[in-house]
Amino acid sequence: MDAELTNRSRDALNAATTRAVSAGNPDLTPAHLLLALLEGQDNENLVDLLAAVERRPGGGSARAPSASLGSLPGVTGSTVAPPQPNRDLLAVIADAGRRAKDLGDEFLSTEHLLIGIRPTARPPRCSPGRAPTPEKLLEAFQNTRGGRRVTTPRPEGQYKALEKFGTDFTAAARERKLDPVIGRDQEIRRVVQVLSRRTKNNPVLIGEPGVGKTAVVEGLAQRIVKGDVPESLKDKRLVSLDLGAMVAGAKYRGEFEERLKTVLSEIKESDGQIVTFIDELHTVVGAGAADSAMDAGNMLKPMLARGELRMVGATTLDEYRERIEKDPALERRFQQVLVAEPSVEDSIAILRGLKGRYEAHHKVQIADSALVAAATLSDRYITSRFLPDKAIDLVDEAASRLRMEIDSSPLEIDELQRSVDRLKMEELALDRETDPASRQRLEKLRRDLADRERSCAAHRPWEKEKQSLNRVGELKERLDELRGQAERAQQHGDFDTASKLLYGEIPTLERDLRWRPAEEEAAKDTMVKEEVGPDDIADVVGSWTGIPAGRLLEGETQKLLRMEAELGRRLIGQSEAVQAVSDAVRTRAGIADPDRPTGSFLFLGPTGVGKTELAKALADFLFDDERAMIRIDMSEYGEKHSVARLVGAPPGYVGYEEGGQLTEAVRRRPYSVVLLDEVEKAHPGVFDILLQVLDDGRLTDGQGRTVDFRNTILVLTSNLGSQYLVGSAPEEEKRRQVMEVVRSSFKPEFLNRLDDLVIFSALDEDELARIAGLQIAGLARRLADRRLSLDVTPEALAWLAKEGFDPAYGARPLRRLIQTAIGDRLAKEILAGEVRDGDTVRVDRVEDGLLVGRAEG
C-alpha cells in the first residue's frame, strides 16, 4: 500500500496516527484521517475542492470531526500498543484505491482519500443533503485536475498551476488595478508585431531599470481588454509567470521541473489563448538547475522555437548581455525590442496621466508645477537612475510626506491638548480642598485653563480643514471607482448601467470636487497644506542627494550674476582669478555643451595665495557645502602602477571590488568640485585619463561603469613657475615666464581642453591685512561657541599683517602667527581659569608683541 501512496497521502496517514496516539485512541479512524487531511500543511487543493462542492470555504468541514474525536474510546498506560487502522479506515483506503484505478491513476492521492472518507466520517447532526456526496466530490476533482492523471508522487502541486504561479494582467486591467500607460505606442506596436509572427513570436523588452518595460506589457494588457489589438491577440489572456514561486518550496528533486512542465502544458492546452510574460527574463537561465537538473531556459526552448508558447520577456541591458547572450540557442528564440529612456517632456506627460491615481491614493492635491519640477529636477540631479521611474518616485514620496504631515497632529496643538487635560485633573483635585491657599491656587488654575481652552478653540479649524480634505480624498476614490465600473459596464455591453454612471453619478461627483476647491480657495488662511508643490519635490530631491532644496529652485541666472561678489568675500587679492572663474562658469552655464564638465581650470601660483581656498569657495557657492569638494593629492599618483587607483584596479588585481578613488567619489556625489592638488607631481598617465574627462565629461571605471563628470567643476592646482611670480619683474613678463614653464611641462592636447589657465598673483601687505581680518573673524566665531567675545585693536591687526607678511609663502605664515600669538596664549589662560565663559578677550599691541587677556570693566 505504501508504494502506491503519494507523498502527501503518506504524510496525512502519519499525522493521523500521531493525532490518535496523542488522544490515547487505540484505533485509527476515518475521523483522524479527515482531520489530518484538512488541518495539515499544503492542503489548499482539498479546501478548494470542498469549497467548490459546498459553495463555501472548506474550513468549516475541518471542525466537524474534531468534535467527534472526544467520543472515541481512549486508553492510558506505558505499554499501550500503537493505534491500528480500524475496519472503516481500511474500507476507505480500499475504496480510494478502486477509484484511483478507475481513473487510470498510478498513485493514491489525498483527493482519492477524501472522496472515500467523506461518507463514513460524516459529523453527527449533519443532514445528508448538506454533506458532499462522493459523486459530487469526484466531479469537482475531475474538473480541478483538467483530465490529467496522477502519475507522480507529487501530483497535488500540479492542479491549477497557472493560477497558482501566475498573475493575470488582463484580469487586473479589467478591474482597473493597473496604472494607465501614457505613450510607449511604438514599443507596444512592435511587441504586437512580434507576437503576431508564426514562429519565434517572443519579444524581449530590453532597457535600463526604471524606463518602463513592465509598463509596456501592462499597456498591452489594457489594449487587449479594450479590443485595440489585431485579431490574432483579441480576447487573449496575458499571464505573468512567477519563477520565484515555482522554485520556492520545491523540496524534492524534479519538483520544480514538474511545476514548470504543468504550467507549460496548461498554456499549450489553451490553444494559443494565453500569452505569457516573464519579468527579469534572465532568471530563466539556471533557474531550478540544482543537482544536474534541467534549468527553466532549456525547458522553454522547444516550445519557443515551435511557436507553441508566446512569451514576452523583460530584462536590463546588462543582464541580457551577461545571461541571455551567453546562451545563443535561447537568444535566437527572442526578438529584441529596445525600450529607451523617455525625454523630460514625455516623462511630464506620463506623470500627468498618473496624477489622478496618486491623488486618490494619498488624498492630496498635486500641482502641475510639481510634476514639471519632478521631471526636471530628477533628470538634472539624480543621474544614477532613469526616467520616468525616478520622477514618479519623487511625486509619490512628496505626496506621502504631505499625507503624513496632515495625519499627524501639529506639535503645538498636541501639547496644548495635553496641558488642558492635565489642568482639568488638577482642578478636580483642588476643588475638594477648602483652605484659602488651595482656593487661591484653584482660581489661578481656572484662569490658566480658560486661556488654554481658548487657544485650543482657535486651533479647531485645523480639525475641520483636515476633515474637509479627507472628504475630498474619499470623493476622488469614489470617482475613480465609478469610472472603473462604467468602463467594465461598457466592455460587457451593459450600456444602461454605463449611461447612468457616465451621465448621472460621475458628473455629480465631478461638480462636488470642482466646488470644494473653489470654496477652499475663498478661505485663504488655511492651517493644513493640501497640495504638493515644487518646494515639496525639491525637499525630497534634497534629502536624496544632499543638495539644499532652496538652491534647486533658485534661477541659475540670479545665482551666477552675484558670483564675483560671493567669491570675493572669501578670496582676498585675487580679483582677476575670481573674474576669470566666474566668467567661465557663467559662459558654460549659458551655452553649455552637455558633454563636458561645468568648468575645468588650471590654477597656477605660489603657495598660500588662495588656490585651494577658491576651490572651497566654489563648492560652497555652487553647492552650499564646502564638503562638496573631492580633494585628491596628486603627489600620491607619481608612480605608474598607482595611476589605476584613480579609476579602480582591473579585473584579477587586488582591490578590483573597491572601485577607483576618483570615479567612486564622483559617482556618489556627481555635483561637486573635483580638486586635483599639485597636479605637476602626477605620473603622465594621469593626464591621459583626464583627457577623456575634459573632452567627453565621462570616465569608465575598472568595473566597466560609466561615471558622469558633466556636473562637476574640475580644478587642477600647480606651483609651476611660482618663483617668477614673487619677483620684481613686470606683470606681463611674469605671466609669460610662467606660461613657458607650463607649456614645457604639460602636453598641448591637455592644456587645449581646459576652459582657462588662471594665474594667481603674490599677495601684498594691504591684502594680507584684510586676510588677517578674515582670520580673526574665524577665531571669533570659534570663541563664540564658548560664550567668549574677542576684541582686537587696529594696532594689533596691523602688527599681525606686518609680522606675518612673506611674499614667498603667502598667507600661511599669517595663520601660524595668529595661532601662536593669540590662540595658544588664550588656551593657556582658559585652562588656568583666568578667562571664563562670558568674558571679553582683548588683544592689544605692546612693545614686544601682543598682549592677550581678559578685558577689564
Curated annotation (Swiss-Prot):
Residues 5-72 are annotated as: Repeat 1. Residues 85-147 are annotated as: Repeat 2. Homohexamer. The oligomerization is ATP-dependent. It comes from the Bacteria. GO terms for molecular function: ATP binding; ATP hydrolysis activity. It is found in: Cytoplasm. Keywords: ATP-binding, Chaperone, Coiled coil, Cytoplasm, Nucleotide-binding, Repeat, Stress response. Residues 342-546 are annotated as: Linker. Belongs to the ClpA/ClpB family. The Clp repeat (R) domain probably functions as a substrate-discriminating domain, recruiting aggregated proteins to the ClpB hexamer and/or stabilizing bound proteins. The NBD2 domain is responsible for oligomerization, whereas the NBD1 domain stabilizes the hexamer probably in an ATP-dependent manner. The movement of the coiled-coil domain is essential for ClpB ability to rescue proteins from an aggregated state, probably by pulling apart large aggregated proteins, which are bound between the coiled-coils motifs of adjacent ClpB subunits in the functional hexamer. Residues 56-83 are annotated as: Disordered. Induction: By heat shock. The keyword Nucleotide-binding applies. This is Chaperone protein ClpB. Residues 1-147 form the Clp R domain. ATP 1 binds at residues 207-214. Residues 392-525 form a coiled coil.
